[in-house]
Amino acid sequence: YYSRLLAVSRDGDWTGWCSFFLTALIDQARTNQRKALDILGLYRERKDWIATATRSQYAVRALDWIFARPIFSSSDFVDNVQIPRPTANRIIRVLRQEGLLKDLRPASGRRPAILAFSQLLNITEGRDAF
């Protein structure tokens, strides 16, 4: 990066800089396209899975909410997913037991648990971060 940038000011090598920059742009676009396809594949895979695992008519609504907020507090889920509270709590329990959700911070006293959808986060990070 710096050598190409220096070559612009030192040698007037705008062609080299533009080539470098556009190559990086293409590489990043390919990476982002792969991530988008991986996320879509994960959604399709988990859509069928969650319906079976939870046996709930609200399973897809819960999955959509989790995909939109892959790190969340259990109380935020229960309060905002717009499904009955007992069902929301049961869905969280099932998803934790099945390993779809991981505890980033366990519940303690009045503090709710902080949960993460690690598969989605790992795709977006491009590594096993969670």
Labelled PLM ranges:
Residues 33-63:
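Short alpha-helical segments that sit at the start of domains
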Residues 63, 68-81:
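Short acidic, hydrophobic short linear motifs in intrinsically disordered regions
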Residues 1-37:
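Phosphate/pyrophosphate-binding active-site loops
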Residues 66, 88-101, 115:
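Basic amphipathic alpha-helical segments that dock to polyanions
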Residues 71, 100-103:
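Short hinge/loop at the helix->beta-strand junction immediately C-terminal to the helix-turn-helix recognition helix
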Residues 55-56, 103-129:
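Short, cationic-aromatic polyanion-contact patches
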Residues 1-4, 39-45, 70-71:
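Short acidic (Asp/Glu) and glycine-rich catalytic loops that position anionic groups and cofactors
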